[in-house]
């Protein structure tokens, strides 16, 4: 069973490698480790995980869905947690759900629209 203690050990091992990078940093490296989280079920759980990371001076990217049956990204509580994560240095991105879409032009348009909406709602730019 997953525990925060186990996760801290994973983070410690990654830190020892010196390979931790965000998406922009990875573009300039031959070797890197990117930590990312696709948030499928719980903003609250992602928030707790981000606190563990911050306690170890670790940064990763959290991808949230605009349309999700498990959470409402725009509830006041969820927005406050996500804004706090961003303010504490975590990267926030869009976890796009195709929901049956197949037209690439429409998909690109929808991704851009969702990123713009989230940027407006959160008050910071969503670029990932």
Q: What is each model feature region?
A:
Residues 1-128:
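Catalytic alpha-helical scaffold of carbohydrate-active enzymes acting on polysaccharides/glycoconjugates
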